Amino acid sequence: MWIYIVGGILLLFAAYLIIQIVRCNTAVKESKERLAVYGAETVDLSYGKMSYVDTGKGEVILSVHGIFGGYDQAYDTCKDFNSDYRIIAPSRFGYLGSDVLGDGTPAEQTAAYVELLDKLGVDKAYLLATSAGGSAAFRFALDHPERTKGLILYCSAMPFTEKPEKYPEYAGPPAFLCNDLTIFIMSPMFEPIMGLEPSTIYGMLPVSERKTGVVLDASVTNLDMAKNYDDYHVEDLKVPTLVFQAKDDKLVRYSDTEKAVKRIPNCSFISFESGGHLLEGHGEEIKEAVSKFINDCEKTDCLV
């Protein structure tokens, strides 16, 4: 009797797995077709290649994407601004066609961004960062204030209010989970764990082409503001900052952001009761606030 029960369970599991493999393979194929539409370019920098999207005209917004991102996520974050500004949306280290410089630290990512801007003939830019991209954005503004017009942060990683006594050695998904099928099967758990719709998976595929970046974020980027706390003296920022955060964000603690913004000079903080980590439902409000921020900054020459 038990043999039949166990056999039936194994048969059902095998059928489920086969269905998920077929669905995942289809989704990965469609994701690669989707990426081709972005018209990404690749540039040779001193250390290797960087892929990016460059579109629009006007003041430049350099988009710094989060974990499981790439030039697609970087561009999608800013696509509502495409008619008013020039959007430069590169893949960070290890994501979608971008090589890694040195250890892949935020400081090295900043150096790579400077090279990219030089190649594209851009003197100054606004940095718009989401989630894990916050560390590189802060590093850029601190290291290169002369190249920075302003910081715009969406549910971004934020500096600590005091030096942490300890921090994890790894802050992100384990490397063995970073493959297309595993993440695809786990996607129904996105909502209860991260507050993200399961459909978010379709913007993360192909995971196989983002894995190096994900592991780098978890082992280096996400730890940098804790590990090198003294190097993130954000009180010295020379440009204005605009921060957006939803109170129900499950990935970036709202209370931590509330405390962090008090360290930042000339910082405007806009919070939402809901919207989660992706600030869903607030597109028009955000677009209006960002446009006002840039317009005001241009009138004052972007000085704190």
Outline where the language-model segments fall.
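Flexible "cap/lid" loop of the alpha/beta hydrolase fold
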Residues: 151-180
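Conserved acidic catalytic loop of the alpha/beta-hydrolase fold
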Residues: 108-125
